[in-house]
Regions:
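A metal-dependent, Asp-based hydrolase signature
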Residues: 16-19, 23, 27-92
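ATP/adenylate-binding site constellation spanning eukaryotic-like Ser/Thr protein kinases
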Residues: 3, 19, 122
Length: 191
């Protein structure tokens, strides 16, 4: 058994919902995305007010992922450009609490996580996973699924500190010794 700090990373480090921010990157460059914007706004609203179940989240993202995402020809280059622009938004408090054994468990997609985790030197992380050919979720790291996925991948881990921006992570809070709720640069210990 080993203890660690766990982060619901990208939303708390950057503020906002990373997949939505990435999709908005295309609003400026690709008019085909505009037909998905109303649905993406609804997703943002529902996520902000914790109005999703896992099944509803999968369904909500499906039309965007299956209708638009799989047709992006420059995805890898676009991810690099996205992080070139957004890496500086990582909140400075993270460097103060960072540990070498940190694990990131995030609802963000693996294709977005891979690049930023490599840049900042985080080796242990897991996120949602999307089949790039079909646009379907292979794994959705959201709500109670986070605990299930975490326990499958790190069966001997004990969570000392858990940092999150959302009460949606109640299931992760329940298995953590200490919980910190993050709002921008403000961190409040709630457990």
């Amino acid at each position: 058994i080993y203890t660690l700090s766990l982060h619901d990373a990208l939303p708390i480090w950057l503020g906002g919902e990373t997949l939505i921010d990435f999709a908005l990157h295309y609003v400026k460059t690709d008019p085909k995305i505009w037909k998905y914007v109303p649905k993406l706004l609804v997703i943002c609203f529902k996520d902000a007010f914790h109005l999703f179940t896992v099944e509803e989240a999968i369904e909500a993202y499906a039309s965007f992922l299956e209708g638009y995402f799989i047709h992006i020809k420059t995805l890898d280059e676009d991810v690099v450009k996205f992080w070139d622009k957004n890496e500086k938004k990582i909140k400075p408090w993270y460097n103060e609490v960072r540990r070498d054994d940190d694990i990131v468990v995030s609802g963000s997609t693996d294709f977005l996580l891979d690049e930023i985790m490599k840049r900042i030197g985080i080796k242990n992380y897991v996120g949602s996973s999307i089949d790039k050919k079909t646009g379907k979720f292979k794994r959705l790291c959201f709500l109670e699924n986070k605990v299930k996925i975490f326990n499958e991948l790190y069966p001997n881990a004990h969570i000392d500190n858990f940092y999150t921006d959302s009460m949606n992570d109640k299931a992760m809070m329940d298995i953590s010794d200490h919980v910190f709720l993050v709002n921008g640069n403000k961190i409040e210990q709630i457990k």
